[in-house]
């Protein structure tokens, strides 16, 4: 078996001094060395150095397949680094990796935190809202930042969302001669002159965590009244049974609340909606929950809008189901995929009863009532009943 042509080398802020002998040998043998400007300088790559293109692309590395090439990355190349991007396109024998201590390991070591109990997030290229589902009293998070100035922005975001009492540590240039760790609270954050690479450690306090169960309060979502109500949504999510990595079609998405909760459970979603104002609400909710990488809005009419979509693992139809929409969905479902349809009109109820008789599954009638003033007393105020059909292909 031939030697790997590509060496993926993790580099710390201590540069060459922090490399072991095997990594040094691999770097010395490379004809071409790829990396960011800072890494190339730390490794003293000289004329062999090639900066990454903007936007980032590994094609220049792959074009040199067979020649001795080294790629430099921060710390562990497989934590928000180039390592995973490269190895996904290479055979196992083509590469060898030499990881160094990553920033999260160094941060945990400085603070004495157990990594297995700490949330580690790369917020250098992701919205701060990605942190929201993880915030709970006493929760600890290590957040990689775009640059030192982003520490102030993240602290301000925490304070704005009710977590101003959280303790935060701005951790700069860990492992190098310019290492610095400074502490504050999110609300009182006034740390200046931060340098990169930077990380903000957070010990959460003071806010209201998101519930972990299905059926989040409607007040958390932007909507125009067209939203699956919390108790019905909880039953709907139970019927959809989201599993990590699965894809949901949310047809007639309204506010996107079902899609949002499906994604919070680890899935992905395509929210199909026709009305522009509701599309705007869904997009606002996607930003609010930091789900830009999991939830995509598809503006269009079903069934036509479904034609180009990838095959789903689950489908939810919250309104507007008719025979044509059902036929389009049913034709695309793979064996084992789930379909959940809710209806409130007599026409939709009749269709669901017919489909249940033909295809089986479970037909459920959901009737809810809330206590409300009735003169000087209280009485039950019923909501419109919802008929829910659940079936597995």
Which positions does each model-derived feature cover?
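A contiguous loop/helix-start segment that scaffolds small-molecule binding in enzyme catalytic cores
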Residues: 2-10, 21-25, 67-69, 138-225, ...
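S-adenosyl-L-methionine
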Residues: 272-314
């Amino acid at each position: 078996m031939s030697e790997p042509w590509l060496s993926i080398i993790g580099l710390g802020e201590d540069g060459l001094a922090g490399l072991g002998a095997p990594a040094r040998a691999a770097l010395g043998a490379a004809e071409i060395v790829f990396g960011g400007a800072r890494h190339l300088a730390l490794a003293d790559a000289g004329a062999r150095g090639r900066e990454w293109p903007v936007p980032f692309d590994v094609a220049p590395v792959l074009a040199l397949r067979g020649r001795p090439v080294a790629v430099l990355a921060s710390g562990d190349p497989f934590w928000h680094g180039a390592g995973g991007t490269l190895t996904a396109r290479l055979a196992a024998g083509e590469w060898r990796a030499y990881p160094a201590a990553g920033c999260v390991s160094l941060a945990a070591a400085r603070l004495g935190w157990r990594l297995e109990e700490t949330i580690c997030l790369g917020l250098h290229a992701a919205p701060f809202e990605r942190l929201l589902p993880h915030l709970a009293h006493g929760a600890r998070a290590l957040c990689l930042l775009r640059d030192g100035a982003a520490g102030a922005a993240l602290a301000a975001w925490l304070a704005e969302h009710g977590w101003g009492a959280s303790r935060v540590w701005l951790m700069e240039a860990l492992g190098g001669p310019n290492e610095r760790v400074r502490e504050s609270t999110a609300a009182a954050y006034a740390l200046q002159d931060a340098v990169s690479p930077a990380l903000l450690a957070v010990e959460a306090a003071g806010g209201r965590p998101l519930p972990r169960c299905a059926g989040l309060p409607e007040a958390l979502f932007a909507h125009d009244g067209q939203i699956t109500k919390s108790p019905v949504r909880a039953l709907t999510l139970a019927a959809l049974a989201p599993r990590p990595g699965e894809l949901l079609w949310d047809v007639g998405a309204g506010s996107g609340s079902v899609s949002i909760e499906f994604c919070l459970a680890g899935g992905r979603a395509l929210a199909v909606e026709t009305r522009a104002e509701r599309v705007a609400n869904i997009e606002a909710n996607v930003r609010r929950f930091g789900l830009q990488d999991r939830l995509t809005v598809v503006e269009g009419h079903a069934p036509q809008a479904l034609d180009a979509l990838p095959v789903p693992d689950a489908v939810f139809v919250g309104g507007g189901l008719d025979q044509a929409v059902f036929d389009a969905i049913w034709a695309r479902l793979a064996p084992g995929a789930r379909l959940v349809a809710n209806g409130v009109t007599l026409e939709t109820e009749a269709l669901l009863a017919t489909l249940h008789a033909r295809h089986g599954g479970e037909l459920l009638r959901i009737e809810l009532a809330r206590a409300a003033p009735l003169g000087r007393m209280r009485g039950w105020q019923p909501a419109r009943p919802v008929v829910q059909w659940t079936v597995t292909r």
